[in-house]
């Protein structure tokens, strides 16, 4: 995982050079300003476009699965609800490298209790996956989850609409992936994410898969610059 993070960081620096070059256009053809070739820029643009499609697909799947989760909760099947909870979340966790661009939707869908209370000084208004998680594991029942499940579905629908307008850049993808892998290695590994269900390993796997998707998209450009990476 460390090697993956280092590799992604190297491409992030390359993408940063591209952004810097575009902001420092000069008429002097001999300028020392670093910039990408048209071919490399096209590769970056293609990778960015494909990744956005990937995220849209993940959020589509998240919505479908969460609607089914809502039905399971409504039926009162506690065992099934606990079984599918971590599996459903994986689609969201694969998209987390660009969660920064989700804005308030990320807060509504994936905010942990400790973070919510830290910002709002109370639990009032707290919702999302982790609100349902606490009821399922701490109270060991599906009762009381229905309203949160309905709100969660609506919040994911809102996110789905938002994704279509989000500007995804190579810098956002790459720095987001590196930051996420670092978070997994230094913070999430303690179990802080799924504090009630202890299903963190599913999150780790999905986070790494999301970062690997970014790596795969940029791999041709990485190998072109340094085949040893």
Regions found by a protein language model. Give the residues of each.
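Bacterial lipoprotein signal-peptidase II cleavage site
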Residues: 15-32
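Sec-dependent bacterial lipoprotein signal peptides
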Residues: 1-15
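Mature extracytoplasmic or organellar-lumen-exposed domains after removal of signal/transit peptides
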Residues: 31-229
């Amino acid at each position: 995982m460390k090697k993956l993070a280092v590799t992604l960081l190297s491409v992030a620096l390359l993408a940063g050079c591209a952004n810097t070059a575009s902001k420092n256009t000069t008429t002097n053809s001999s300028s020392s300003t670093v910039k990408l070739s048209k071919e490399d820029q096209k590769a970056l643009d293609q990778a960015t476009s494909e990744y956005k499609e990937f995220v849209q697909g993940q959020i589509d799947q998240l919505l479908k699965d969460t609607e089914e989760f809502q039905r399971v909760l409504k039926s009162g099947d506690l065992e099934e609800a606990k079984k599918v909870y971590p599996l459903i979340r994986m689609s969201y966790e694969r998209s987390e490298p660009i969660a920064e661009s989700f804005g308030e939707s990320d807060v509504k869908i994936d905010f942990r209790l400790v973070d919510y209370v830290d910002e709002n000084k109370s639990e009032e208004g707290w919702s999302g996956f982790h609100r349902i998680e606490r009821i399922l594991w701490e109270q060991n029942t599906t009762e009381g989850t229905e309203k949160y499940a309905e709100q969660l579905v609506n919040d994911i629908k809102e996110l789905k609409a938002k994704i279509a307008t989000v500007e995804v850049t190579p810098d956002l993808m790459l720095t987001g992936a590196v930051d996420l892998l670092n978070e997994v290695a230094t913070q999430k590994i303690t179990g802080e994410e799924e504090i009630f269900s202890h299903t963190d390993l599913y999150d780790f796997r999905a986070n790494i898969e999301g970062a690997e998707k970014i790596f795969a998209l940029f791999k041709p450009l990485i190998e072109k610059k340094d085949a040893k990476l």
